[in-house]
Amino acid sequence: MDVPTRTDPPYVPIRTSRWAPHQKAPRWLLLAGALIVVGIVLVALVHKPSHAQQAGDLKSFLTDVNSDIESCSGGVRESFQALHRVQAGANSANNVQDTISIARYGASNCSPANNEQLDDLTQYQVTESLAGYHLDTAVNDVVTWAFPYAQRVQNDVANELGARDAARRQQYAAALQRDTNDLNRQRAAIDRILNKAITATGAKASPPNLAG
């Protein structure tokens, strides 16, 4: 008599560990996060600069910028004064040569590569209390006023006085007029930014005295 073959059901291991429920963030952790956000907002409000602080910081800023640009600006002013003396009749060979030397030196001094103060200005960091007044743009514009505009103007002075004939002298005089116009437009752009900041903060100050 044949004995029927026994067929057992497939073996399924019994799970010994529990299914991990979905973990929710503890309430205290959510509360701590909310408190941190509130704290950040309160700190920002507490440290919002007053008009008095902004006015003081702006005066310091203008003093710094004026100090860094004044040697270049002074050279431009001196070059124009010497040129006007020559054009007014003090045109001896010595005076002409002196004016050329003044202008060449001034042009060199308006390059950040040759002027440590101007080089400092290229790396100037505006304080956070003055954020929003576009003073970074003003600083860059002052550097550009010096180099290349002020440098070009003084080289034009030297070139005009050193010209060997009337045609070249006229050519350099036209270049001087054109570059002086560029210099003055750049100064006007700087003054617009700085005067707006001065008015907004109530600072008792003026923009840098840029020659032109």
Functional labels for PLM-detected ranges:
Residues D64-G212:
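Alpha-helical segments in soluble extracytoplasmic regions
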Residues R18-P21, L45-V46, P208-G212:
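Short, aromatic- and cysteine-enriched interfacial helices/patches
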Residues K24-V46:
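Hydrophobic membrane-insertion alpha-helices, especially the h-region
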Residues G39-L62:
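C-terminal region of N-terminal signal peptides and the immediate post-cleavage residues
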Residues S17, P49-A52, F147, E160:
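Short, intrinsically disordered, low-complexity terminal segments
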Residues H22, A34, A52-Q53, A150:
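Intrinsically disordered, low-complexity regions enriched in polar/acidic and amide residues
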Residues I14-L29, S50-H51:
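Short, Lys/Arg-rich cytosolic juxtamembrane segment immediately N-terminal
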Residues M1-R18:
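N-terminal intrinsically disordered, acidic low-complexity segments at the extreme N-terminus
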